Amino acid sequence: MLMPKRVKHRKVQRGRMKGVATRGNKVVHGDYGLQALEPAWITSNQIEAARIAMTRFIKRGGKVWIKIFPDKPVTKKPAETRMGSGKGSPEYWVAVVKPGRVLFEIAGVSEEVAREALRLAMHKLPIKCKFVAREDEMGGEANES
């Protein structure tokens, strides 16, 4: 599972997911991508499940890029614990995703295979996503659905 090797602060505040993604919103490495349409916290387990679903379908052909990294720790207090006595201990890691962010990219496979692989990955994630293609050099969209 993905998690940082070391962090400056062990516990962070929850924060807010306002606005749309201004960075990481274009397909840059691969030919096709999976773009988020809703804001959410994506856990490292969900990222890994989506990655496995994609790589199994493309049968190790082609290449997959994971464009998000879970760098935010989420804390949890033990069950049946009274309120107070400090913040809980870090339980898992999440990636903060805003609408428009490209989550995964894929290359080296046909569009039909990429579309199906990303559809399988979409079902492993807690948000609505859409299939996007890399923009051609002239600036227009090559293919979007």
UniProtKB/Swiss-Prot annotation:
Gene3D superfamilies: Ribosomal protein L10e/L16. Keywords: Ribonucleoprotein, Ribosomal protein, RNA-binding, rRNA-binding, tRNA-binding. SUPFAM superfamilies: Ribosomal protein L16p/L10e. InterPro entries: Ribosomal_uL16, Ribosomal_uL16_bact-type, Ribosomal_uL16_CS, Ribosomal_uL16_dom, Ribosomal_uL16_sf. PROSITE patterns: RIBOSOMAL_L16_1, RIBOSOMAL_L16_2. Residues 1-17 have a biased composition (Basic residues). GO terms for biological process: translation. Residues 1-20 are annotated as: Disordered. GO terms for cellular component: cytosolic large ribosomal subunit. One of its GO terms (molecular function) is structural constituent of ribosome. HAMAP family: Ribosomal_uL16. Belongs to the universal ribosomal protein uL16 family. Part of the 50S ribosomal subunit. Binds 23S rRNA and is also seen to make contacts with the A and possibly P site tRNAs. This is Large ribosomal subunit protein uL16. The gene is rplP.
